[in-house]
């Protein structure tokens, strides 16, 4: 069975103890009813649009009762526990996924804007910090000494911060620079640029020369 929320309106301002929202409830592609929560800590309510919607909601309730319970892991405040699934919890879960997706998109849009101006590091989809340049990073890389400047900045200022889940988040820095700075693959997000196109990188050039002399 397919249970969906559409035309979701989520209010951050009205969300106090619970998430305040309104949405259309669709079951198997049919607009069956509506769902809402006023944000004051009460239950999420849902109700049918018409007689057909009432029957679809009844079927959805039965369907959700047979789904696995929701498992909540232990943390420093409470022990692990589980809650039996029902349609209300299913609707709440759909809402949380919607909010998370929206927040992730907002986060990534801000991140992408920041990485145009500098070197960005942090926990993917959660948090980040940045070291910015006076010029856009593409202009820095175009300068003859730019690649070496970026490499040295990563090595001296970013690499020491790459712990506790932090990674280099730039996708616009050539991977050859990142590797020359000493980063392992698990310490950075895969960039869209593989090799340097502008300027020179001393470490890379020296490695190439050494390989050439060893043949």
Map each language-model feature to its residues.
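Terminal leader/tail segments of proteins
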Residues: 1-215
